[in-house]
């Protein structure tokens, strides 16, 4: 059941966490000068315009429908939240804080809290950690996960949530469950199958999502 418990975290709880974080990021930066994120067509058009008018983020849809890939694109890969580097060039949060680390494939960030007290770096590292954890589920999924691996991943998720200022109560609840209803397992299997078909059918590298 460890695999399915982690799948539930990835498919249900991480997207919700990313939406909360995106909305908070937007409201902090654009709320006072533009408008707070109310998920209206108008605010989504404004976001699309800030991304250059052409974006892979489905801004024509409610952000409640955005999947993890879109939410990563809308946060750490978004031009809207880009910051200047030491030379004054604008870089996305991923480009500024994550890419320079050169993290090897299959590895996770040792810490998601900025050693220098940079809140933007903490947000970037925490979101990227969730991206790495999400990718691990589909790389490739065998339907099995050892208890030590599950415990490690669970702690990484909790650390990322805490760094983003999010509650971990529901994650703790999943960690303590002894099993899932058969119907829930079937639903999780379907989500994995559909996700794998989308990834490999399009020939998209998981590491790029």
Please give the residue ranges for each predicted region:
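Long, hydrophobic or amphipathic alpha-helical segments
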Residues: 188-209
